[in-house]
């Protein structure tokens, strides 16, 4: 096994028992692939598939004019280059987007020609607005902020059958219904009512009998009955009534008469129930007809019109009920044979027949008019309008789209379903197999008559007791709409608006000689796109607290949003975990609160298929042997197979062991024999999402706490010095790399140069393309503000000279340590109560932790100020501010902007700004002063940007934006100059590195080669030496050497051209950058100048901050205790954190205890390694110890492949503690933890004996830091990875003396953002009442709240030194009086 450059630095010891069959896939693939499919930039114009933008254009174009003589055709589209790159867009507050241009062809037909003849074709490119581009990490930059488009889980188009579970009617009767849901267009519902009549609705409007719809589709009564019923024929004669014998129909019936065979023997006596044996006897007897009683005909319905063959008179119509009068009429007219509908109570109901009787419409036209009146009440139904509406509802491609998915779902549910033998022989089987044979193949993306009839038939068959209803929460009935599809829908809706406008103008296209770009206005398209990305419910401000929160946000799947559910209407079933979620959607990670179950996270291995359904991978099992073959199955496909769990036992050849294996089949857990198993899970962590799979020992935690643990990891604030978790799960590296926080090498090579801002790698010759100068430059992100104001900062993780392979770590980012996710710090933890400071989950923490900056985090705040053009004149950014103290002015430069590096506190001026004041009436004294001293500075008011309350920090960056045409101030100019200077240095460095690399390659290539001549009179045929090359005046003279080897000569020429291109490219880039910086900035209307000040705030850990482990064990820091008072071990080491042991049993998150034990072992092993290194032991001893660590149990590591230097580097990286991986559901067992504890703390070690371990090495003796005495009982001590969460007390603490008031009630506002007061509510009033504190209460309810006059009076009294209160009438009382008056009740106050 070979390790990469990064892996061998710190190998994580894994306890996994099963080898990894499938690598963790790229975690952002869903987003990136979806948008790539939408744009199709990689495909040539003619190779683009009908997806995304292409599909949207194809669905709207061609646009044909109303008269039909002009049409616009779509040829292809192109996307330009974005004007600004991503960081520039973020800085300027603009959208990272590219211009979209479509080539459109205008075709004008000849009006005079007898047949369609093209008269003229005009073609040009039309600008269609800007399309936001996705960043490489799967987000979008919209108006300067990073946003994520969350995927939506919605109901798949198709047909669904369900019942109301007996909730609608008091009797508890099941009412069946069906619904055809298109991707776009009207919904069609069919439903039974409690009387078993069948109705339909369009778009949830008024219900109408379903037979109206069938008549509107062109069926008459007789045809309707013919479709939905089997027939019975009765033969009438003077001897009685006979019917054709259909054996299958007799089962379970009671014989109305004696059934006799041909000899007259009784086969079934009258009144007896007919059994299966009786039916066999009847069939064997060869009977073809049965006698029936004439009375049994009564109540049956006729299947067809009965017409007298002689007179042509209609004796009875189809669906008429047979009565005695009708039978008598038949007798008189000599009717010998009648056909009725075969109806029984058990499995052939009279639903359609009864519905037809309630339907009064006569024929197709009347039925369509009835539908028109229901859809457009009050509008007169003209024949044309009626036809148009009916056809547009379900049969027009413009207004109805079932989509590819919808058609597939529809066909599988209706035409392609498996029928039982009884169904095959019934009307339903005939309908699907004969009448509608081939309907599934010709079905387009609109509904056909057959589709509607097949849906009704399936619903009737369900009511008859055949078939199953659908489960709408099954993931086979819910599909994912990702970014690409959501954007495509918005784009299409914008294009549809364009189409309406274009149609109006197309008629004038020829007469006015218009071109395509004159006809098309792209505003509606760009408005639709802008609205979607800017304010859609699914376009969300990206959660960027740490790399995990970024990844999880992009993998989120929401059931909310347009076309989805709403929180209020979503019931329990939709939110619940469903068996089909297995391996597709995480059962653990979902928010607490109103969104629980509606917002989910994709499982680690889940992906979407072409139809949008979620799939999960499985290993194929053949004859009990597990193969390496992997298939992705959707929820529908999975239902057909028997699937074993990932932890099923296998022998060395991969065969399933044991008589029975735990499996899943159709959502149920079963025990199956190995030969029945068809698939097996790929990994134990397949079920859960990324965040949940980061929790070690997840299998030992209660699900509710695991949910909290998964959610709280996303809120962890990046620490100043990230520290990898000692106990991880092995997926940390994937998260760090895929989130793009840590930088990995694009190509292998040698590290040429490293500083804090840049890493330069010279690419290996075999990975560089021919003639290309192979240098990769990685510019690192330094101290940048994230969306949540946390700090994004990348640190190089390599040294000059390191040899890297593709995918190796180049630089660490926020919350990553050696390319692994590191959200918190490893803390030594003791579980014990300590003076009540850990009551109710509080956390007692050592002062040493705060002093060592273990949990110190940097937060970057961005403060903006804009200078606008006001009616009274322009605002000015200046240093000249009235009444500003000298101390504050010293921080500002001559332009009035704070210096970088200045330490600022609340209230300090950051940017000086003055606003013109309106002309005020001057007093005579002021006039006199004006006359004496001339114009003064009093006609401006100070509107400077000041540091907000409760905030202090260091200014780390200032950006100044100036509108085009306005003089830049010195500060703005100096920022531009320094930026250009830095950029030029960057380019020069790059060119230098390119040059050096190129000439190194040339030297390796030509030294030792023969030359035909060259500079400094190089003789023909002489060999080129290093000395000769060194002696040339310039390295560029090397290109003048004429080589004998033509291939090498060509390569030399290529490198020369390549270098020249690089130089030209660098000059071009510099000019572009210069132009970007020196041209005016696009600012909002009326804004002349904008200044952004970035302030870095250091937040140390303090009491009130929220902290948590990874198991949902959260708490608030109650006290930071001096290190000398903390409980300490026998060797004098104090613990870092003291937690309450009572927080574990009731919460049932035992995983934290196992983590603590394994962490304790990791720390002990680290200490032993540290001791060995300090004692300078031989590499062989280290290798032997590491072998015991890595190859004792679990996954084996190949340490023999490492050199002694690599072993020493690995050991020194483990000094602080070994790295363990305990994968989810395949983690370390108790015995393995004991094994590690014994390795860390061997009993023969005297140091170990001193600590006072218990037998299992999990508890030690601790001493009280205050008294020095040992605690009575041994205490569980260990190491846990503990996180500091984003809920910091600094951001929540807030105090107010006076501040803003509400206009109506005159009471203080509430909340920190409004600088509000504390509400003294009803319960607090009771408390004061209980104590009888009358004066305090009076103050609270009047002067301190909303008694304006009393407040003013009290202030005056205090100023005068009179400490008394004159309380008046609270304003809220006046509001109450007004409220009562508004209800028409007069109320007056009588003052005494």
From Swiss-Prot:
GO terms for molecular function: DNA binding; DNA-directed RNA polymerase activity; ribonucleoside binding. Keywords: DNA-directed RNA polymerase, Nucleotidyltransferase, Transcription, Transferase. The keyword Nucleotidyltransferase applies. Its EC number is 2.7.7.6. GO terms for cellular component: DNA-directed RNA polymerase complex. It comes from the Bacteria. SUPFAM superfamilies: beta and beta-prime subunits of DNA dependent RNA-polymerase (SSF64484). GO terms for biological process: DNA-templated transcription. It catalyses: RNA(n) + a ribonucleoside 5'-triphosphate = RNA(n+1) + diphosphate. DNA-dependent RNA polymerase catalyzes the transcription of DNA into RNA using the four ribonucleoside triphosphates as substrates. Belongs to the RNA polymerase beta chain family. The RNAP catalytic core consists of 2 alpha, 1 beta, 1 beta' and 1 omega subunit. When a sigma factor is associated with the core the holoenzyme is formed, which can initiate transcription. This is DNA-directed RNA polymerase subunit beta.
